[in-house]
């Protein structure tokens, strides 16, 4: 399951790492936009298999940030 950015912003912090167990609703990435920090949560429970962003990276709304299987 793809975890996508719900806003355009900058990756402020990565909360989970490849191989970590992730629960539904767990914050995987924190985005910063207009000086506000917004968590991007996993919609499913599983294991983080891919991380497609890095801290400080600018991302567009809809960009795939991570993958949980």
Question: PLM features: what roles do these ranges have?
Answer:
Residues 23-39, 60-69:
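Short hydrophobic beta/alpha edge segments that flank linear recognition/processing sites
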Residues 7, 12-21, 50-53:
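Short histidine-centered loop motifs in beta-beta connectors
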Residues 1, 13, 25, 30, ...:
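Secondary-structure boundary/capping motif
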Residues 1-10, 27-43:
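Short beta-strand-turn/beta-hairpin segments enriched in glycine/proline and small hydrophobics
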């Amino acid at each position: 399951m793809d975890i996508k950015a719900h806003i355009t912003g900058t990756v402020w912090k990565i909360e989970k790492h490849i191989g970590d167990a992730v629960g539904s609703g767990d914050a995987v990435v924190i985005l910063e936009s207009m000086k506000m920090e917004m968590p991007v949560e996993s919609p499913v429970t599983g294991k983080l298999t891919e991380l497609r962003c890095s801290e400080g990276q600018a991302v567009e709304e809809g960009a795939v940030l991570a993958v949980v299987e």
